[in-house]
Amino acid sequence: MAAIPSSGSLVATHDYYRRRLGSTSSNSSCGSVDYSGEVIPHHPGLPKSDPGHWWASFFFGKSTHPSMTTVSESPESSGTFSISNGLIPCRLAQESLQKQKVGDPKSDSSPSA
């Protein structure tokens, strides 16, 4: 079971203000920050989560990585895909192009002599 650190390294996403705790530093994998006890306002133009770590999107739901795109196959016709955010993973695009070349004689990739 993981222990919760008492140095305040957990992030509260629902608070508008973050309260810094009375410790002098944090010795965690989340980075080292000095805490002095004052209330720090959250700027309205900035996201409330900490986007500085690759794993932040797993907790805060803001994924922009192309391989994290949700792709689902249409049940009506095999080979038709629905993509949720407009990005196509490279492997899926390559497989789709290869299938089109096999089925379409006009897009034959062999060089003409």
UniProtKB/Swiss-Prot annotation:
Keywords: Developmental protein, Differentiation. The keyword Hydrolase does not apply. Pfam families: PPDFL. One of its GO terms (biological process) is cell differentiation. Transmembrane segments: none annotated. InterPro entries: PPDPF. It comes from the Eukaryota. Probable regulator of exocrine pancreas development. Belongs to the PPDPF family. This is Pancreatic progenitor cell differentiation and proliferation factor. It comes from Xenopus tropicalis. The gene is ppdpf.
